[in-house]
Design a protein with these regions (language model features):
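Short N-terminal or domain-adjacent regulatory/targeting segments
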Residues: 1-2, 43
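C-terminal active-site "lid" helix and adjoining low-complexity regulatory extension at the edge
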Residues: 30-33, 219, 234
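Short polybasic/polar patches that bind polyanions
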Residues: 35, 102, 125, 230, ...
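Phosphate-binding site of ATP-dependent enzymes
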Residues: 149-232
C-alpha cells in the first residue's frame, strides 16, 4: 500500500448528531492505520473538500452534505476510487432507500411516502397505521425533529405539517414495530459483521431507542440477518 495518496474527507458536525466524538475517532483511527501501512492521507474538512481541487487518486469519505455527495459522484465518474461511493450514500437517504429496499424484497416496515403538505389521516387509517415513525425523506437526518414517533393519525398529521413549515417537502412514514431494536455494522464480502442492542449500550442519536426500551432477548437468526444485510448492500 506504500506510495498510495488518499484524500480523507471528514464529516461536518451537523451530520454527527450526538456522535461527533465517535465519528472523529473512527476517521482518525482509519487514517492512522493507513499511514502505518505506508499511505499518505491528506485530511480535508467538508468545506475544504468542496472548495478545492482533489488530485488524490483515492478518496476516503465520511461526508454527508449535498454538495459533498455530488462531488464524490463526479470524482467517481472521473475514475477515482471513492470509499464510500457517493451513489451509495445518496441511496441511503430515506425515501430513496425505502423505495430500493421495498422494490427488491428486502424485509422493511410497511411504509408510506408522502408530500408534507398532504392530508394523510385517511391514508394512515386505510393502511392500518396507528403508532408510526415519520422521517424526513429528502436527505439524511440532522436534528431530532427529523425523526418523529407518533401514536395516532391525528398526531401524525400535526407532525407532518411541522415538517412542511421547516421546508422539508417529502417524508417517509414507517409503521412502528414492537420488539427488540438491533443495530448492526457490516462490510460486504468480508467477515466483519457486528450487532448490538443500542438502548442497552446507551448508544443513541436522538434518544428514540427508549420507545422500544430494554431488549427482551428475542432469538435472532444471525445468519439470516447477515444474509438480509448482504442483499440490501447489493
Amino acid at each position: 500500500m506504500a506510495d498510495i495518496t488518499i484524500a480523507g474527507v471528514m464529516r461536518a458536525g451537523a451530520y454527527s448528531p450526538n456522535h461527533i466524538g465517535n465519528d472523529t475517532a473512527i476517521f482518525n483511527l482509519v487514517a492512522e492505520q493507513l499511514r502505518k501501512r505506508g499511505c499518505q492521507v491528506n485530511v480535508y474538512s467538508e468545506e475544504q473538500f468542496n472548495k478545492q481541487e482533489i488530485e488524490e487518486p483515492v478518496v476516503l469519505a465520511m461526508c454527508r452534505e449535498r454538495a459533498s455527495i455530488a462531488k464524490l459522484q463526479k470524482l467517481e465518474d472521473e475514475g477515482k476510487l471513492v470509499i464510500n461511493s457517493g451513489y451509495g450514500i445518496e441511496n441511503c437517504t430515506r425515501e430513496r432507500m425505502t423505495r430500493i429496499l421495498l422494490g427488491n424484497g428486502i424485509p422493511y416496515p410497511e411504509s408510506l411516502i408522502v408530500n408534507t403538505n398532504e392530508n394523510i389521516k385517511s391514508q394512515l387509517k386505510k393502511a392500518g397505521f396507528k403508532s408510526c415513525w415519520i422521517k424526513r425523506g429528502d436527505f439524511h437526518a440532522m436534528h431530532k425533529e427529523d425523526v418523529s414517533y407518533v401514536r395516532h393519525p391525528e398526531e401524525a398529521q400535526e407532525v407532518l405539517q411541522e415538517y412542511f413549515y421547516r421546508g422539508i417537502t417529502r417524508a417517509v412514514i414507517n409503521v412502528h414495530l414492537v420488539g427488540d431494536l438491533v443495530k448492526f455494522y457490516g462490510v460486504k464480502d468480508s467477515q466483519f459483521f457486528y450487532w448490538f442492542y443500542p438502548f442497552d449500550e446507551g448508544h443513541s442519536k436522538y434518544g428514540w431507542e427508549e420507545v422500544n426500551g430494554h431488549s427482551q432477548g428475542i432469538d435472532i437468526d444471525l445468519k439470516e440477518l447477515k444474509d438480509i444485510c448482504t442483499r440490501a448492500a447489493e
